[in-house]
Amino acid sequence: MAFQECVIEVAQDQAEAWSDALFDLGALSVSVEDADADTPDEQPLFGEPGLEPKQLAWNRSRVVALFGDDADPAVVVAAAANQLGIDPVPAYQLRAVEDQDWVRLTQSQFEPIRIGERIWVVPSWHDAPEPDAVVLELDPGLAFGTGSHPTTRLCMQWLEQNLKPGETVLDYGCGSGILAIVARKLGAGDTVGIDIDPNAVEASRYNAERNRVEASFALPESVSEASYDLVVANILSNPLKLMAAMLSARVRAGGRLVLSGVLERQADEVAAAYAPWLPLTVWRSEEGWVCLHGTRGAQP
């Protein structure tokens, strides 16, 4: 089956209305994009979690609607414009989208990723690249974190170089469970992953089972407030600052804290947020991101 893609450039305040109208009139899918993407005028829109976006669409928004080959996009666009009280009907672009083996196409875009000296993240449709590699079998999909982002790589490299056998580990904001899983594969003891997203918890459990690793994954309210030898959190700077007291309390006396998801320019303010409990320094940076680490001293 072939498809038709219809692209309409609209004003920022019309993007949501156009999306709703096209979908109601039979579009198979509708998305809104920045019309200036990949140009000097590209407009960042969404910030970190905990910070409300200043606006909900780009100044020059592009509405992209997908139709089946039996649909008449011209009729649909005209009907949507009439429904919205817009006259004349705006210009739009049409292009044919040929049906493909979408699974094979998607798989071809993901190759094994080497992290550090021995760690490899390998999709299920690939073989392990080295016989003595520490292999994480992980497919892109249900939740976040396949090892491709610098912050994930930094945390995994830290674990490879610094984790001590038998240490207990808390992975806060576990996403796909990748850090908890690699910690267990590197010799960690009891390991717990926490995430506020039930889908992430589900994905982490699935990935741990697939990798033949024993680790616990749960929502925050389901986990006791125990302390750990190592706490790792790869989130973003604003949530990390808000959770400074809580995350620090999860680190036992003499234990270590590892944070990432922090830009180089944000490192000092994140370290300052944790200063009442433990000192944090930059362990390593990559592509503008940093990994912070520190040891909690003996508690009074």
Curated annotation (Swiss-Prot):
GO terms, biological process: methylation
GO cellular component: cytosol
Keywords carried by this UniProt record: Cytoplasm, Methyltransferase, S-adenosyl-L-methionine, Transferase
Location(s), subcellular: Cytoplasm
Residues noted as binding S-adenosyl-L-methionine in the record, renumbered to the chain: T152, G173, D195, N234
EC number, as in UniProt: 2.1.1.-
Main location: cytoplasm
Enzyme class: transferase
Catalytic activity: L-lysyl-[protein] + 3 S-adenosyl-L-methionine = N(6),N(6),N(6)-trimethyl-L-lysyl-[protein] + 3 S-adenosyl-L-homocysteine + 3 H(+)
Gene Ontology molecular function, alphabetical: protein-lysine N-methyltransferase activity
InterPro entries (alphabetical): Ribosomal_L11_MeTrfase_PrmA (IPR050078), Ribosomal_PrmA_MeTrfase (IPR004498), SAM-dependent_MTases_sf (IPR029063)
Superkingdom of the source species: Bacteria
Family that this chain belongs to: Belongs to the methyltransferase superfamily. PrmA family.
Purpose of the protein: Methylates ribosomal protein L11.
Protein name: Ribosomal protein L11 methyltransferase
